[in-house]
């Protein structure tokens, strides 16, 4: 399992609505600086950002020690012709049942799956189709007014699925080496 470049999710602009909180679920394509580390989801460390609307990111949340639950609909990654590869088309997500008191802690995580293989997040979990997960992190609900960079998610872990052509080329190369060795032995 290879590490993907750390992905940071901008979780800001939380607003209280009774027992619900609204989170802006995005991974902005900001310059890679100390204040805004690289937030792109990459296919391999240092590789290009992933694209394709078949890939989806889902925000998971729970009270500390609780079970992670998906927050509403997943966010689709951008089309292959995008100028912002590695980012998804996010938006507001509602976190229900976590309390609304400043100081309340919420555990969060992001998971990525391919809807061409699994239609829903639950199906991807059941079928072992999660392509990567961020490290679980704790977010503390702040006292308003909120800072725009309220929390960052780090260390997106996943694995790279090789293209079928790479596997095929590897097999052709291995067969050629085998035949060459066999030819020299004759």
What do the predicted segments below correspond to?
Residues 1-4, 163, 180-186:
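Positively charged n-region of N-terminal signal peptides that target proteins for export
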Residues 6, 64-66, 117, 176, ...:
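Generic "edge-of-domain/loop-turn" microfeature
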Residues 5, 12-18:
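Sec/Tat signal peptide C-region and signal peptidase I cleavage site
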Residues 6-9, 24-25:
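Short helix-onset patch at the extreme N-terminus, typifying the N->h transition
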Residues 10-12, 173:
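Short, intrinsically disordered, low-complexity terminal segments
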